[in-house]
């Protein structure tokens, strides 16, 4: 059975038969309902904030990183020192104005394709098929997409169905960053089930990408899933390494980043190494395509940010942004990861303050005014409470936990989930 009502049936069944048992076994991890939802909030709100911190600098810094450690949402009217290259011709340079006008967070491809995936999984189930997701893309995803996503969507109009839309022979952008930034939600669906999260993230990546162009998506898929229970960022990166096929430039690069992290105290030295070797990667007769939005250099700077950020939200997102390239994507992905690791409650005062002070003339009393405004996806309602989105992601996760050997219990009067984890 795999229809929308499946989630409600599973959850209701578990609630009506909650049991009391002793501690979980070695392969099981226990998380309370409250902690799970706090981490889901950190995941979604973290991605939003990371996106907005990185957005003003998207694609502006390539040869060198940004000369400051970005710690705020910059705007096009910035006139401080040092001089910074900020996008000034579109919404990327006017985020507070956009947020104030719309009354909350607004959609961008760092979250809105995941939002479509949420709708798709609610409609078809966790075992959604490629023909079904292709139809969801054709219905909801038509504008505000670029490179591999744009090419895949064009191919759908020509009659191709995923994963043919991501194959090298069909999609000339198969190596670009697109799948990393649109598939993190699979990790939230599978907390602590890193293999399932990575498998489904890869499934999603193949809609647009192929070969090593899917490898960063796999790594982050496993890492974000693991972050529900693992707080050591080095261990998270090791989990990402193990999830990725042991061939290709990203597999080589992620090991290099770990090595450089052990050699250099300053992340800027590691960024120099990444740019030198992986921006225009060559090995033997093989030359990787060169692009400011390639999954290779971008994916590696995200790993760098996770290591040097040491679990601190603002430090991690600051490094991910300041590293340059297509930096809003790394900022959003790593923000979602650290948001899971620490939960919204552990995101830190500076980060939470930013989510409530984006408007120009007022202050919200909840992150992003508890409002997600859809300005980019067709046939999805305009405004959705962020708290509702978080609850809906959590409902899918509960279903995944129960369908994969986990269970729901009541301990000391509180609901907990016992996850059949592979950590």
Model-derived segments and spans:
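Bacterial N-terminal signal peptides that target proteins for export
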Residues: 1-9
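Bacterial N-terminal signal peptides
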Residues: 8-18
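Boundary at the C-terminal end of the N-terminal hydrophobic targeting segment
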Residues: 21-26
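Accessory "access/gating" subregions that flank catalytic or transport cores
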Residues: 28-31, 155-174, 183-194, 202-208, ...
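Active-site cavity-forming subdomains of large catalytic enzyme subunits
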Residues: 45, 102-210, 214-217, 229
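Catalytic phosphate/nucleotide-handling subdomain of diverse soluble enzymes
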Residues: 49, 53, 60-76, 209-212, ...
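Active-site-surrounding "flap" and adjacent substrate/cofactor-binding loops of secreted or lumenal enzymes
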Residues: 55-98, 111-113, 134, 144-146
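Acidic, carboxylate-rich catalytic segments that either coordinate divalent cations
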Residues: 251-254, 258-288, 344-423
């Amino acid at each position: 059975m795999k229809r929308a009502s499946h989630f409600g049936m599973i959850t209701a069944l578990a609630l009506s038969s909650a049991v009391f048992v002793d501690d979980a076994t070695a392969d099981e991890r226990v998380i309370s309902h409250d902690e799970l939802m706090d981490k889901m909030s950190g995941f979604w709100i973290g991605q939003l904030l990371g996106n907005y911190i990185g957005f003003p600098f998207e694609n502006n810094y390539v040869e060198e990183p940004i000369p400051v450690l970005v710690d705020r949402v910059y705007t096009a009217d910035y006139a401080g020192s040092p001089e910074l290259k900020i996008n000034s011709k579109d919404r990327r340079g006017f985020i507070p104005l956009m947020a104030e006008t719309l009354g909350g967070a607004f959609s961008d491809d760092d979250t809105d394709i995941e939002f479509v995936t949420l709708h798709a999984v609610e409609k078809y189930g966790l075992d959604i098929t490629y023909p079904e997701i292709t139809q969801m893309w054709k219905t909801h995803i038509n504008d505000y997409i670029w490179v591999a996503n744009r090419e895949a969507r064009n191919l759908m109009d020509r009659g191709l169905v995923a994963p043919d839309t991501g194959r090298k022979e069909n999609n000339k952008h198969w190596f670009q960053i697109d799948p990393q930034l649109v598939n993190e939600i699979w990790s939230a669906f599978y907390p602590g089930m890193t293999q399932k999260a990575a498998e489904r993230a890869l499934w999603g990546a193949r809609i647009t990408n192929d070969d090593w162009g899917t490898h960063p998506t796999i790594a982050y898929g496993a890492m974000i899933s693991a972050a529900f229970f693992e707080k050591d960022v080095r261990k998270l990166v090791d989990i990402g390494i193990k999830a990725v096929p042991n061939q290709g430039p990203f597999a080589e690069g992620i090991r290099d980043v770990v090595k450089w992290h052990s050699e250099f105290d300053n992340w800027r030295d590691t960024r120099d190494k990444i740019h030198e070797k992986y921006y225009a990667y060559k090995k033997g007769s093989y030359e990787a395509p060169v692009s400011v939005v390639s999954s290779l250099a971008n994916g590696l700077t995200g790993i760098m940010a996770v290591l040097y950020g040491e679990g601190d939200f603002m430090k991690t997102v600051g490094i991910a942004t300041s590293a340059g390239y297509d930096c809003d994507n790394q900022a959003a992905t790593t923000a979602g990861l650290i948001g899971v690791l620490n939960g919204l409650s552990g995101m830190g005062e500076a980060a939470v303050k930013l989510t409530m002070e984006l408007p120009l003339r007022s202050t919200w009393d909840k992150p992003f005014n508890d409002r997600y405004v859809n300005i980019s996806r067709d046939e999805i309602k305009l405004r959705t409470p962020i708290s509702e989105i978080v609850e809906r992601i959590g409902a899918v996760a509960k279903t995944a936990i129960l369908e994969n050997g986990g269970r729901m219990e009541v301990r000391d009067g509180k609901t907990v989930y016992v996850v059949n984890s592979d950590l």
